[in-house]
C-alpha cells in the first residue's frame, strides 16, 4: 500500500469524513448518512467454496475501509454496507475489483443466512432448503466507492459496463 493510500485510509476512517464522502458521492451533498450512525466492519472479505475436486477453495481480500451505515431516508430506515477503495494509480479494471469485493460481501450474507436457517430448521420448501435462502430473506445493499488520489486525470472506467466489455450494442443494456 502506498503512503498516499495509507494516509487516505486513516483520513476516511474518521466517521465525519467518511459520512461527508458518502453524502457527496451518493446523495449529491445532502446529509443522509450521519457520523454517529456509522459502525466499523471487518475489512477482510473471505469466501469459501467447494471446488470441482471436492477441495475447499478460500479467497481472501482486504478492503481499505468498510462500514455499516444506518440511514433514515425518505421516511424509512435502511442499513447499507459501504466500502472505500483508495487508488493512487489509474486501475483500468477497478469496477471489476470492486464488484468482486461486493460479491464476496453478498456471498457472506447468504452464507450467514443459510447457517441461521440450518440452525433453526425453518426452511419451508425444498428450494429454500437447497439454497439456504428463503423467498422473504433480504440482503443488505453493498456499495463500494473508489477514491482516486493520483495526479493524472482519471481515464479509466467508472462502471462495469465500461470495462472493455465485448458485447454487441443489443446486449450492452443487459450487462
Residue ranges and their predicted role:
Residues 171-173:
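N-terminal low-complexity segments that are often proline-rich with Ser/Thr-Pro
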Residues 1-169:
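Accessory alpha/beta interaction modules
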Amino acid at each position: 500500500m502506498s503512503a498516499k493510500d495509507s494516509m487516505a485510509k486513516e483520513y476516511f476512517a474518521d466517521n465525519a469524513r467518511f459520512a461527508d464522502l458518502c453524502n457527496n458521492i451518493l446523495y449529491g451533498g445532502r446529509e443522509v448518512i450521519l457520523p454517529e450512525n456509522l459502525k466499523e466492519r471487518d475489512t477482510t472479505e473471505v469466501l469459501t467454496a467447494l471446488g470441482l475436486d471436492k477441495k475447499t477453495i478460500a479467497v481472501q481480500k482486504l478492503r481499505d475501509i468498510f462500514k455499516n451505515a444506518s440511514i433514515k431516508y425518505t421516511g424509512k430506515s435502511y442499513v447499507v454496507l459501504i466500502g472505500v477503495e483508495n487508488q493512487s494509480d489509474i486501475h483500468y479494471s477497478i469496477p471489476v475489483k470492486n464488484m468482486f469485493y461486493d460479491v464476496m460481501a453478498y456471498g457472506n450474507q447468504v452464507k450467514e443466512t443459510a447457517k441461521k436457517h440450518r440452525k433453526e430448521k425453518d426452511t419451508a420448501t425444498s428450494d429454500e432448503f437447497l439454497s439456504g435462502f428463503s423467498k422473504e430473506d433480504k440482503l443488505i445493499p453493498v456499495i463500494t466507492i473508489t477514491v482516486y488520489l493520483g495526479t493524472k486525470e482519471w481515464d479509466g472506467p467508472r462502471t462495469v459496463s465500461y470495462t472493455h466489455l465485448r458485447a454487441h450494442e443489443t446486449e450492452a443494456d443487459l450487462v
